[in-house]
Amino acid sequence: TYTYECIPESAGLWAYHDHGPNHTLNTARGLFGAVLIRERDAKIPDVESVLCFHSWTPPVTGLQRAYQCVNGRAFAGNTPTVRAKVGQDLAIHIVGVDDNFHDFHLHGHRWLDAAGDVTDNPSFGPGQSIVARFTVDNPGRWLYHCHVLAHQDGGMAGWMLIDP
């Protein structure tokens, strides 16, 4: 067991992953994640989720394509389900923990990006993170997925369930 201490220089969502001699295997086994650093006086959302987008190629001879995963799992129903209620302040943090570029798309909802523009499909690169933060106003079952079609087809998708 190791304990690490640091003084963060800036707020944000920071990805971590293994850098040891077997880092590819260890990352495939799930040795990655995110650390969220908030500003001291930041308003904490009512509901918060962290989604790590990444690929994984099983070590099987002849397998031609990688799984496209969310938090180590692939395909809606197997990936994390984001849950909230109408009226709640929801923050979904999405981070790329592989070497791919991704587009996060959430059906049925829009929010303001860091520049103040309305979006429902922001792009981000390796090691980068974005946040979809909004007041939930549209009940139902909504799909989220990577808008890179090969990633979506490979399983990078999940559900968001909004209760009235």
What are these regions (language model features)?
Residues 1-164:
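Copper-binding active sites and cupredoxin-like electron-transfer domains
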